[in-house]
Structure formats: structure tokens, C-alpha cells
Amino acid sequence: MAYFELQPAESDLQQLAEQYWEKIGEKEQQLEQAAFEAGESIRNGEYTLANLETIVRWKSERVVHYLIANSEAQIRRILAVAASPETSTRGAINALTELRGVDLPIASAILACIEPERYTVLDFRALEALGHARHDVDFYVEYVAFCKHLADCRVIEPQQELPGPTRMHALERALWEWSRSRPELDEFPESVFAAHLAAR
């Protein structure tokens, strides 16, 4: 079982999420906007390579070219599974990682764009802000549950005017910005993990 400890103060989260958006630059803002629009299209049944590429480009331009190795039928089938409300987090991740070019962090970004109220992006900066560094599918399931618990406690408000206007995505932005704004990246030993996953 994973343990998380929120590093920034809860009272700083909203401001950190706002700073994230201000600092990322116009190109990144456009990529994020397009990614969440593609996620909405997937949620509405448009299971296409173009939508998948748009989301992957937002998180990792260098792996987009791997996506063309997947057949259109495979992409349609896997995106349908991932977008289904009945699919578990584990099932959605396992389906998405069957695609060439999609690893766990990319799969988490795809899910966050499709269902921003349900999922968040697995990112090393956000993990640092929770005092954690490792990740696998089991870890991601617990990470989503912890972030969902924080979001449900209303420690942060949705950024209604931005892509993915949910508490989950605002929290991911805040955690990312907290990590980026630190003077140096520290390694987090296992002894740092003091807070038990409260969402259970």
C-alpha cells in the first residue's frame, strides 16, 4: 500500500494551480487545451488515432510516432474500453498500455483527458509534491484514490476557464507547480511517507 504526504500547504494549492497555468507558456496551454478537447471527443465516442495523438503530443511529443504502429481497429477497441464508465482504473490502464507508445504515465494522461473528474496525470513532479517517486499500476490506482480524496475534500476549486475544469486537474497543476517552484529536486526516501492513504 502506498503512503502519501502532501508537501505543499493545502492553502497554497489554488495559487499553485494558477501559477502553473501562467508559467507554462502559450504553446503548452494550446497543447493542453487540445488534449482535453480530444479527451472529450473520445468520451463522446470518437475513438480515433487523431484524438489519441493529440493527447499524447501534450505529454510527450517524442513518442507520438510510435502510435501509428497500432491499427485503427485496435485503437478504437482500446479507447472504447478506457472511456467506458464501467471499466476499472486497472482495466483502463492495462488496455491503454497494450498500445505501442503508451506507458503508464502516458496512459494516465489519456485517462485524465477523457475523464478529468475521475483520473489525474501520473507525473514525477506531482509525485514529488506527495512525497513519492515510484510508480506501477497498483501505485497509480492508489495515487488516483488519494488525489480523488483530496479533490473531494474541496482543498482546491476547479479552474473553470481552463482545460479539464475539475478539482482533480487543478490539483495536478498545483502539485506540478509546487515541485517546479522548489529550488532543487530532492530524492524522497521511503521514510518520508508518513501519511496513510486516507481515501480508503
Located regions from the model:
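Catalytic DNA-binding helix-loop module of base-excision-repair DNA glycosylases/AP lyases
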Residues: 91-131
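Helix-hairpin-helix/helix-loop-helix acidic hairpins
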Residues: 57-102
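Generic serine detector
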Residues: 11, 41, 60, 71, ...
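C-terminal accessory module of base-excision DNA glycosylases/AP lyases that mediates lesion recognition
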Residues: 1-53, 119-200
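Short alpha-helix boundary/capping elements
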Residues: 59-64, 114-119, 179-180
